[in-house]
């Protein structure tokens, strides 16, 4: 059963960001659906995607001189640190904590997309395509 649905509410109209967000939803749902035996490996795949996703956003924000970069990056860092700690504890047998993370992340993600990422994509659109090209270079 999905814990989060990719929907218009999460759609920002920015192709790269929307693709990352759709993958985030798909992978988080895979963690939610994973058996206990497969939970940690599904969480590993989710964390690996999220590391790349957040690093990409961080690079875009830095290249575009996004004013609240540090606040946005700190939120990314905190969520990744939490996911890594929960992964460690789930690998040690604390599946209840792992399952709790999966049920609580969707609310955080929806708020993050609506506030933080919406501001970021608006800023990037105003700065033009060069901001992302600089980040990719």
Swiss-Prot record:
One annotated GO molecular function: iron ion binding
Keywords: Iron, Metal-binding, Oxygen transport, Transport
Coiled-coil boundaries: none
Pfam families: Hemerythrin
The protein's role, per its UniProt record: Oxygen-binding protein. May be involved in a storage mechanism or for delivery to oxygen-requiring enzymes. The oxygen-binding site contains two iron atoms.
Record-linked PANTHER family: BACTERIOHEMERYTHRIN
Protein name: Bacteriohemerythrin
Organism name: Ralstonia nicotianae (strain ATCC BAA-1114 / GMI1000) (Ralstonia solanacearum)
